[in-house]
Amino acid sequence: MTPKELNNKANEIRQDIIKMLLTAGSGHSAGPLGMADVFTALYFEILNHDPKNPEWEGRDRLFLSNGHICPVRYAAMAHAGYFPIDELTTLRKLGSRLQGHPERERLPGIETTSGPLGSGLAQAAGYAYAARMDQKNFRVYCITSDAEHQEGNHWEAVNFAAKYNLSNLTAFVDRNNIQIDGYTEDVMPLEPLKAKYEAFNWSVIEVDGHNIEAIIDAANMAKAIHENPTVIICRTIPGKGVEFMENLPEWHGKPPNVGEAIEALADLRTLSGKIKSEHE
């Protein structure tokens, strides 16, 4: 896909997120909107995968640690062809395959059921370690939130991955600076995050999380690193594309009402598929 097509796709995904949350009447708005560009880059350029054969042995594995942002993953998967886009309207419904946190047993293409925050990187690191033992060539990716870095078990996984030089593992950090209790630096400061990962012997790449080309370039750089695992710190704006949601912790864990959804969709449609990044 061309850069313009990728930006248009990310905008379509953002619009679907708003519609899904409105229909569900519950869920998280800020994180999914902020990560639409990363998931577009993953599902349409970075991942080696086959939507028609989601259990293909050679596929790259994508773990979503902060499962509450799953609307963006579901929307990206639907647009990639894993299931009909119309099914997105079943988000959080009783019996739906699209639960409020992804469940592997329900939806093909999900590698693991998302559990407590902070546990996803441990799952991904274990999978990457097993892949190396089995001499498999696929890569393992893990999406984590910044607030998950307040969990001790996350750093145990960081240490484990470095000890075993898991160069087949790439983590993406959604560095959006908010969490349910407020701003991360007020709740429990995370900076200097880059230096912390470097101290654990990870390769660190920092990118504008709304520049799809930069995200793709960073993932390609990670593939070329063979000495240690890589983390890509994505500086994102929570609620990106919807002006009244951007950078506000109160939108971490609530959906829009009808009026807010209409305003949000108007904002997104005005963008015509173009989310401005710091590089422009």
List each language-model region with its residue ranges.
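Cofactor-binding active-site loop characterized by glycine-rich and histidine/acidic residues
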Residues: I17-M20, P32-K163
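Short secondary-structure boundary/capping segments
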Residues: A80, V187, E246-E250
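Glycine-rich beta-alpha junction loops
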Residues: D37, H68-I69, N176-N177, N211, ...
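Generic beta-sheet signal
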Residues: D60-L62, F138-Y141, L169, N228-C234
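N-terminal capping segment at the start of a domain
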Residues: K9-S26, D174-N176
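Thiamine diphosphate
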Residues: G109, T113-A224
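Non-catalytic, mobile gating and regulatory segments of ester bond hydrolases
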Residues: M1-E5
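Glycine/aspartate-rich loop-and-adjacent alpha/beta segment that forms the canonical ThDP
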Residues: I212-E280
